[in-house]
């Protein structure tokens, strides 16, 4: 990975949105960086804050608007389903496969899920 896009999964995105232990450090880190994610983030992030105040929902939409998204296509979903091995959950496989679509443009993959990070590293 040698580009300038930083790929976020939902665990990292929600830490940017909510007040969690890693949030302040992650917020400082993201300043000036170009962010990307899967189209899946649109649903997963909104589901993660659906029970919260309207202001949090608005902040979620504003933050989502500034992130480049990889479209979910049948081919991408098929590739995600074919990742070898056990232990990688379905949504995590979709994030990893989405990141692989941007491989040449990526600086790194940001997640707080160890299994997902291991799969992303293993697959390149």
Predicted regions and their residues:
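Short, contiguous hydrophobic alpha-helices characteristic of membrane insertion segments
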Residues: 14-20, 68-70, 124
């Amino acid at each position: 990975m040698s580009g300038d896009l930083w790929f976020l999964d939902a665990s990292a995105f929600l830490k940017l949105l909510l007040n969690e232990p890693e949030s302040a450090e992650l917020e400082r880190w993201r300043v000036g960086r170009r962010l990307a994610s899967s189209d899946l983030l649109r649903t997963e992030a909104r589901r993660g804050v659906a029970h919260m105040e309207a202001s949090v929902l608005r902040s979620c939409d504003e933050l989502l608007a500034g992130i480049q998204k990889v479209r979910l296509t049948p081919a991408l979903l098929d590739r995600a389903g074919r990742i070898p091995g056990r232990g990688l959950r379905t949504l995590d496989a979709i994030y990893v496969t989405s990141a692989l679509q941007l491989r040449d443009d990526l600086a790194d993959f940001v997640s707080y899920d160890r299994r997902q990070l291991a799969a992303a590293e293993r697959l390149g």
